[in-house]
Amino acid sequence: MPEYVNWLRHASPYINAHRDCTFVVMLPGDGVAHPNFGNIVHDLVLLHSLGVRLVLVHGSRPQIESRLAQRGITPRYHRDLRITDTETLECVIDAVGQLRISIEARLSMDMAASPMQGSRLRVTSGNVVTARPIGVLEGVDYQHTGEVRRVDRKGINRLLDERHIVLLSPLGYSPTGEIFNLACEDVATRAAIDLAADKLLLFGAETGLLDEQGRLVRELRPQQVPAHLQRLGANYQAELLDAAAEACRGGVARSHIVSYAENGALLTELFTRDGGGTLVAQEQFELVREAAIEDVGGLMDLITPLEEQGILVRRSREVLEREITQFSVVEREGLIIACAALYPIADSESGELACLAVNPEYRHGGRGDELLERIENRARALGIKTLFVLTTRTAHWFRERGFEPSSVDRLPSARASLYNYQRNSKIFEKAI
């Protein structure tokens, strides 16, 4: 079977979920200048064709720098914000205007044999961003550099309702007719908040947020962001992360940071369970909870391969349905990726930890430890003093977590009478 068939099947829930949602996408000037820009445009057109309401915000910093260099003007910054004098503003207007026209032209392409054939998009931009001057900070006059005051929510939504892609540039206008140079991150964040967007998607050079070892941080809560900002210091990755967290605090459900250099990064982030960048979200992307009857199918998908390998004791659907209240599960984007069960043992202060299983693709994220802690807490709440576990393959894992070797003789009689000598499981116990 072709690989794309499986991909479409796995992507179909996301295709349905994203339809009629509002996404604000921020692409910095470096991303527009990158060779992968054409692929990003194709991916945006695909999102539009799938019913996503798109607002695209572009940056222009390198393009402005180029104009300044041509005129022999030295750029000035304070706190990584450009100081925009009159000469610089002329360069900003020139660069932004030309870049906006270039993006509109790319989105308007209708080339035979291209991903955009027949798309016939309508791209609209205008004076929908009202701005005000930053003014003087720490004795520095930012002059024509401004900040977003508001966006025209009704006007933009009307365009989105009519199936336009709305293109926002990093320029804002005051009621008195002044023009202000804006940070595209500020425009995108405020647009996402004011439009009550479902997602804010921020493009950067990196795959997403990387930790101290260079590993991708896949998910964060807004309250976890300040610690990472302190570690990152003053760099563009920190700006993106700060914008993502601000949007979430402002009511945007999810913010994503993806790479403009990686072909297909946007689609991977939106249409696969684990994505390819960093997600900042108020709600939990992955949830540890008590199992419900609706989870039986997902539990069977998880444990059946392990039963076939002899790692777990076989359980029929009927048994799972009857014992579902004993289970705790880890759910990730609707998929049950881990489980464990607690069985109190009659006429004793003991319980059995059973059916601890983690999807092979997620075995290095501490989910087993998380479930073990949850089971131990449940056991304590039930007055259980000793926790038993029977295993054939994972003895060392339990030993490393405080379980001691035990025997059938140590099992309460109600459980000892059910011991399967043919399976010959090793027995461990832990005082809790």
Curated annotation (Swiss-Prot):
Keyword Acyltransferase among UniProt keywords: yes
Compartments in which it is found: Cytoplasm
GO cellular component, one term: cytoplasm
Keyword match Amino-acid biosynthesis: yes
Pathway(s) served: Amino-acid biosynthesis; L-arginine biosynthesis; N(2)-acetyl-L-ornithine from L-glutamate: step 1/4
Catalyses which reaction(s): L-glutamate + acetyl-CoA = N-acetyl-L-glutamate + CoA + H(+)
SUPFAM superfamilies named among the record's database cross-references: Acyl-CoA N-acyltransferases (Nat), Carbamate kinase-like
GO molecular function, one term: L-glutamate N-acetyltransferase activity
InterPro entries (UniProt xref): AceGlu_kinase-like_sf, Acyl_CoA_acyltransferase, Asp/Glu/Uridylate_kinase, GNAT_dom, NAGS_kin, NH2A_AcTrfase
Pfam families referenced in this protein's UniProt entry, alphabetically: AA_kinase, Acetyltransf_7
Keywords noted in UniProt: Acyltransferase, Amino-acid biosynthesis, Arginine biosynthesis, Cytoplasm, Transferase
Gene3D superfamilies: 3.40.630.30, Acetylglutamate kinase-like (3.40.1160.10)
Superkingdom of the organism of origin: Bacteria
CDD domains given in the database record: AAK_NAGS-ABP, NAT_SF
Ranges where the N-acetyltransferase domain occurs: 286-425
Known EC number: 2.3.1.1
Subcellular location, principal: cytoplasm
GO terms (BP aspect): L-arginine biosynthetic process
General remark: A functional ArgA is critical for the production of the phytotoxin syringomycin and, therefore, for pathogenicity in plants.
Similarity comment text for this entry: Belongs to the acetyltransferase family. ArgA subfamily.
Protein name: Amino-acid acetyltransferase
Source lineage: Bacteria, Pseudomonadati, Pseudomonadota, Gammaproteobacteria, Pseudomonadales
